[in-house]
UniProtKB/Swiss-Prot annotation:
This is Anthranilate phosphoribosyltransferase. It comes from the Bacteria. Binds 2 magnesium ions per monomer. Pfam families: Glycos_trans_3N, Glycos_transf_3. Anthranilate 1 binds at G82. It catalyses: N-(5-phospho-beta-D-ribosyl)anthranilate + diphosphate = 5-phospho-alpha-D-ribose 1-diphosphate + anthranilate. Mg(2+) 1 binds at S94, E227.
Length: 337
């Protein structure tokens, strides 16, 4: 076993960790074997050094090895998720996009927790709608099979996350756990859209996904947002056949207008709930509908639907039909049986 002191000394010297060292470090983290002051020091050292794809992949495996098993789903399974921490407090676009994608016929496993850095995290929103977020894995699997939608509440699958919650709250900044969050979905989706909070993270995240053997994925950075942007360019790294292809898209590539970032500002859970409800009912504002649609359109690329404009129009029609709220309502009802 590698000693914690030797790992910490390397980090204080801003040296990269080996796969084994990173695995051991995050095993210590998740088992609560690191005191709070040292936790904060380690997280800051990693941030200053900049995390490598090897360190991230090793951390993911350590966290998976300390996570409850989720039953395997037949066929493709999608994930739409952001790292959080972009600082803009926009409405819950990835959560809404997941519900819309499920309505469009794609099985989506949404994994996350309550807010650490934003005003309203994905599971804050879901609870405000009345979703029972603490379903057992077999119940969540059945919900996925019935309604194409399943919510996996992170602390339910690994209670070790309680050991690092205080450090993350104290630091009030993005840490490696923002990066790890999208990668440790216990349902292990094979087609994922991951938004990152920094352009510098696109390639490390993409390389990590390749190292983890993910089938198809896109990593996106939307000019300040951890999702596909409707206010400016989105930088993309797409993974296919273990190859990483980098490119850039803009709102015109999706066939939509360019909006202002302030058009997407969210608020407290109750305010976000009402905004999201209107979108799902087909009564949302154009900017809100567009923001959700472009993210689902990007997911559809992973299913060999390459025409982003056509994808966006298909999704907008589904949103405007109001059927998406029915999907959420079915999940709410199922989760409270």
């Amino acid at each position: 076993m590698i000693s914690l002191k030797s790992i910490v000394d390397k980090l204080y010297n801003l040296e990269d960790l080996s796969y084994q060292e990173s695995y051991q470090l995050f095993d210590y983290f998740i088992k609560g074997q690191i005191e709070l002051p040292l936790q904060t020091s380690i997280l800051i050292a990693l941030k200053l050094k900049k995390e490598t794809s090897i360190e991230i992949a090793a951390a993911v495996e350590a966290l998976f090895d300390n996570t409850k098993e989720f039953p395997k789903i037949k066929g493709d399974l999608a994930g739409i998720v952001g790292t959080g921490g972009d600082g803009f407090n926009t409405i819950n676009i990835s959560t809404t996009a997941a519900i819309v994608a499920a309505t469009a016929g794609y099985k989506v496993a949404k994994h996350g927790g309550r807010s650490v850095s934003s005003k309203s995290g994905s599971f804050d929103l879901l609870e405000s709608f009345g979703v029972n977020i603490e379903l057992a894995p077999d119940q969540t699997k059945q919900c996925l099979e019935l309604y194409n939608m399943g919510f996996l509440f992170a602390p339910f699958y690994s209670d070790g996350f309680r050991h690092i919650k205080e450090a993350r709250t104290i630091l009030k900044t993005r840490t490696i756990f923002n990066i790890l969050g999208p990668l440790i979905n216990p349902a292990r989706p094979n087609k994922v859209v991951i938004g990152v909070y920094s352009k510098d993270l696109i390639l490390p995240m993409a390389k990590t996904l390749v190292n983890l053997g993910i089938d198809r994925a896109v990593v996106v950075y939307g000019s300040g947002l951890d999702e596909v942007a409707i206010h400016d360019d989105t930088y993309v790294a797409e993974i296919q056949n273990n190859q990483i292809i980098e490119y850039k898209v803009s709102p015109v590539d999706f066939g939509i207008y360019t909006y202002a970032i302030k058009d997407l500002e969210g608020g407290l859970p109750e305010q976000n709930r009402e905004i999201i409800k209107q979108i799902l009912l087909g009564k949302g504002k154009e900017a809100h509908n567009a923001a959700v649609a472009v993210n689902v359109a990007m997911l559809m690329r992973l299913y060999d639907k390459d025409d982003l404009k056509q994808n966006t129009q298909e999704v907008l029609e589904i949103i405007k039909s109001g059927k998406c709220f029915n999907t959420l309502q079915q999940v709410i009802n199922y989760s409270n049986k």
